[in-house]
Amino acid sequence: MKVVMSTKVDLASMNIKEKLVENFGFSETDALFDGNPVFRRGDVLLLTTNEEMIYYDNLDAAIETQLGIKPELIVFASRHASKAKMPALTTHVTGNWGKAMYGGKDRSLAIAHPTAMKLALLKLNELNDLGWTVCYEATHHGPSELNVPSLFIEIGSSEEEWVNDRAGEILAETIVHVLENAGKKHEFKPALGIGGGHYAPKQTKRALEGELAFGHILPKYAQPVDEAMLTKAIERTLGGVEVIYVDWKGTKGEMRRKARDLAEKLDLEFIRD
């Protein structure tokens, strides 16, 4: 079973949930999760919680305890907030390169699913008739303590966008597409992304135009990290990675060297851009 996670305290999340139920035939079951009705469509459960999802460590265990199923993939339907209030449709995996400021644990990463993230990015881009930005975000915030792959797909970046009906429709269709296709074979090259700003412009461009599929992305502002964290990012990627990709100008000198050395050590392709 796969899970779409929503929360009552997030306007974008409720917008997306509403569109999933209205447009994609998710129907209410007798089951409850965190006291809220569980909706189902085939092998996908649509769950709702009552608090911020970024603090929901061990969600997979809670699902197993309450519903008796171990999810194979969790998609969080969420808002994105930023001071710039840039209208955006984004996807990313969660975790903390250093100190945990917003959920999760210090130096802990959730399990990335590069195929699901790339499928999300491509579908968001295809459906985007709003003229908004479509991009990856760097790995950030919680939850980090999940033992199954997960990703956030988000509407940003202010209340005006969170409640936009078309944005909700795009996110709902994207989520269904991801869940239907993430388990199939694709000719993608999974990559660890290093460098650049929070919205990972170079990684986004590479993924939209070519075969690279990013899991964890380490932005410049979170650098430097040690080799152990880079190795953890690879280990916490479903199936591992084939490529270490570096946004050269957007990466500090010592991280360039660490990335190149690690690629050599692990016999991975190294791309500097």
UniProtKB/Swiss-Prot annotation:
Enzyme class name: hydrolase
Full protein name: D-aminoacyl-tRNA deacylase
Keyword Hydrolase set for record: yes
EC number(s) stated in the UniProt entry for this protein: 3.1.1.96
Sample GO molecular function, one term: D-aminoacyl-tRNA deacylase activity
Keywords: Hydrolase, Metal-binding, Zinc
Recorded name of the encoding gene: dtdA
Catalytic activity: a D-aminoacyl-tRNA + H2O = a tRNA + a D-alpha-amino acid + H(+); glycyl-tRNA(Ala) + H2O = tRNA(Ala) + glycine + H(+)
Cofactor: Zn(2+)
InterPro entries assigned to the protein according to its UniProt record, in alphabetical order: Deacylase_DtdA_archaea, DtdA
Subunit structure of this chain's protein: Monomer.
Family to which this protein belongs: Belongs to the DtdA deacylase family.
Function summary: D-aminoacyl-tRNA deacylase with broad substrate specificity. By recycling D-aminoacyl-tRNA to D-amino acids and free tRNA molecules, this enzyme counteracts the toxicity associated with the formation of D-aminoacyl-tRNA entities in vivo.
Stretches assigned to coiled coil: none
BP GO annotations: D-amino acid catabolic process
Cofactor remark: Binds 2 Zn(2+) ions per subunit.
